[in-house]
Structure formats: C-alpha cells, structure tokens
C-alpha cells in the first residue's frame, strides 16, 4: 500500500450526506487540502474528525475485496465467514457493521431487510471504485441512525482529464479467481460522464474449517455517474449502481451447501444551485436489495429505502459559516412477502467558526422524528488546533443512536416496545509532521452505548440488554520516507470493548500493520506488508481465545508504459492458518497477477 498514512494527510476526503457529496462529484482531481468532516468544507489540518482514505492504488493492493483493504487501517478489523462473497463485517473501534453507515456515490446502501440494518462487505468488490473514505467516531448528528462507529463513503471511478478517457483491468489468480473491469468517461467545462462495468468470479475455498468442498462467488456490477452544468448557477446530475451476485456458503459442519443470490440497485438525482453567498442542493435517492436463499428458513429478503433531502449553506462572515437542511426517509422490508415499513423526518444544522487562523470550532445538532417511537436528538462538537506548523491537535465529542431495525421490530422474533440504542463518543488526537519525510499520529477514543438490542434466548425475541457497552482504546500510526525510493508506514491499535464488564466477541485487543514500499527502479515498485492480530475472543455462549496470527503479503508493479502496468500479488506468503470467526477458514497462500491500462 503506497504510503497510505501520508496520503491520509494529503488526499481529499469528500464527506457529507449532500452538498459535500455533490461537491466531491464536481472536483475532478484529488485536492491536496480540502476535506469534509461535516456539512461544511474545511482543510484537513482544521478538521476535528479522524479521517482515513484509500485510493485506487490501495484498493488494487487489497485485491478484489474492499474489506481486506480496509482491515489494515488503524482502528479497523475484519470478521469474515469464509472467503470472497461470504458474510463479512467491518469493525471500527470495536463496534461492528451494525453501527457503520455506508454510502456509494451518495446512495445509502445498508440493507433495511437485514437482521440489523447493515452492509455486507464480503460482497463489495473494488473493481469500479476509485476512493474509499472512513470518518471515525459517532456521526449521528450528520447522518442519523447507524453511524455510531462512523461512516464509510465510497466514490466510483471518475475521469481525471478533459476529453474521453478510461481504465481497464484484468486479473487472474488462486482459487481460479477471475476479475475484469472496464471504465469509460468524458468531461469538459460543462459535462462529466462515467460508466463502469465489473465481473468477478472465483471457485473459492471451503467457508467452514470442518468442510472440504469449495464455496464460490460470482458477481457482475455496474456504476454510472453523469452531471451537467445547465447555467453558471445550476448543475444537475445522477448516479446509479447495480450488482447481481451469487455466494455459496456452508449451512453446517457436514458439507451441507447453500447459496444466496443478491441483487442491489440504487439511483440518486440531484440539483445544485448557487445564489451569491448561498449554496443549495436538492436530492432524491432510492436503494433496493433483494436476497434469495431457496433453502433458507426465510427465503426472500427485500429491503427498500427512499430518501429526499435538502441542504443549504451560507458564509455568514469570513470566519463563520452555517449549513442546515431537512430530509425524509422511508424504509421497507419484505420477508417472504410479509411487509414492514417505517419512516422518519429529520432537521439538522452545523455551524463552523474559526476565531483565528490556528483554531477551528464546529457544532452540529440533529433531530429525527420517527413514525414508530419517540424522536431523537443527536449532537456533535469538534475542535482542531494547529499548535505549530507541524503539530495539530483535534478532538470531538458526539451523541448518537441506532434505531431498532425493521426485522428487530416486526420480524418473527420481534421484541415489544424496543427503543433506540443511545451512544456517546469522545476522541482526542495529536498529529506531528517532521518535515516532508515523517508523520506521527496518536488518537485515544472512547464510545459507550446504552439500551443495547440483542436476541434473548429466554424470551426468544429481541430485547434491550441492561448495562453499558463501552469500547475504548488507542490508535498509533506513522510514516517515514528513508529516501525517494524507500518508505515505511505502520499503525498499531489497542481496543478493549466490553458489555457490562464482559469482553465483546471478535474484537482484537491488539492489531499491528507495517508496510515497506520500495521503488526498485523508475518503473518497478514493490510493497511488503506484515499484519499481526492478537487476543481475540469468539464462540457461542462462552467466549474462548482465537489463535493469534501474522500474515505477510508481498506485491510488485511494473510500469510497461506511462499508462499501462502489470502487477503481481502474493498474499499470505507464509501460508498462515488462522480464523477471524471461529470455525471459518481464511485464504491460504495465494498468487494473483494482473494488468491495468489507462487510456
């Protein structure tokens, strides 16, 4: 991964549910300074949020799986029920995907028909993606429910120069894994177009460690983006996504196989209007997920979401800016034809004030009015102080919530009178840069959740769990360039997550990731990465330790021309046998080769 941590300092991170997303779509190149840690833009040095960025090179190194690329970031871990296509959860600061918002080109893609509203990262492939941005900490004041741990924003491929352009990638590797992706686009002063197609297929390996048969995965996907500048003041656009995949899995420990077909589709249309000091953005989006398991207890899960949103912003003074908006969301779930639905209307605002050049303050407030239970207030305050030209201190405090899912409220095991889970989070970080060669960063975090919703065996239904769930820890990261050709990056995370004093399952206490990037020649580059995970508990009922493990990955890339490169990736070089979920396999030693051409 080429200097990921240093790029976290330099890359743009387009981040906002509306205007920020729209403006990121306007920006063709990665701006070196501008970020969105809230509704209003700011510089990376001035944001109080902790933001991580994966660009297309990082995603390529992670292979077809976006989850594998995310898992090497500080504060992030992965739990997977097998290989590509199986159920996989990304944990951020000890909290699983239930508490993580996910958006693709401004479209919310978490599944309303899931047991808990969440996104399955096991089926997210990297072929059509250009950038993945993670903003950590409770973000309910910005994004509403399901953002207690943070939000992941995904942007698909975009043209980076005027005229017609594109990119094609072909890859083949272990487990008979085949990947093909093609993107084409066009841009000029008024129009931007992008269209991407991707196909991934693999024979895979057995998901369960007790079985022997392979569990394969195949998926086709497409993404589209178009925007047109109608006048100097009005811009309109649309983004869309579609995927159709089939995942094989093990139903039991006795070679009992099964498969799930999932079709996802989404569409978003937006209009941006500029009026002097004012900016307005109107958008409507829809998302649908259709999962089918012919032999499952529940065979068909259909989840739908419709959302309408307005966001406005204005610069009140040279030091103060205000953003505000409203949105309406309706979610529906159908389980074998039995339908449930719920809606909410929200109002939100953010104010940002910079009393002096080295200090920026921001505050957010949001109110959600739900159709099924009492409304919820959530808030966030953040501060960034540039103590010196090389040192930045940032901190944030937020309150949030997770509304019970449609399945938890209305499904076959629904609980009576479920209330939203509520949370509080705090983080404090210091970042220091040593010239152009090195960076060090330390961030302490604390998140607690009350009214946790879990399945109760005593009542055979979902119920609120007494006590408090708390996750606390420390993230350390850094990078150092020994020369123009050799650099080092690394991060370590300590996490202690407990519910009423009992450790949570599948949360590593220790995670370490180190990488060395070496440009052998002007055309040949290589990356060696070592990842170590220790002290993880898992099990059913009684939690017992999983074995600690160390995984070594090696990759190399050769530039055939200025726009074409060939690459090879050797993953799990030492053929380490390990589990991230008890009883489920992970990949053994695997080799992948590919070629990528820009035109």
List the predicted regions and their residue ranges.
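N-terminal periplasmic "start-of-domain" segments of outer-membrane beta-barrel proteins
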Residues: 30-61, 89, 223
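Extracytoplasmic beta-strand/coil segments of soluble accessory domains associated
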Residues: 36, 67, 71-108
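N-terminal periplasmic accessory domains that precede
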Residues: 66-69, 88-91, 100-103, 119-124, ...
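Short acidic/polar hinge/loop motifs at secondary-structure boundaries
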Residues: 108-136
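Periplasmic-side early beta-strands and strand-to-turn transitions of outer-membrane beta-barrels
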Residues: 140-141, 153-155, 159-163, 169-171, ...
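Structural signature of Gram-negative outer-membrane beta-barrels, strongest in the C-terminal barrel
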Residues: 231, 271, 284, 315-323, ...
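Outer-membrane beta-barrel signature, preferentially recognizing the C-terminal barrel domain
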Residues: 254-274, 301-304, 371-372, 390-392, ...
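Gram-negative outer-membrane beta-barrel transporters
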Residues: 354-356, 361, 446-448, 465-539, ...
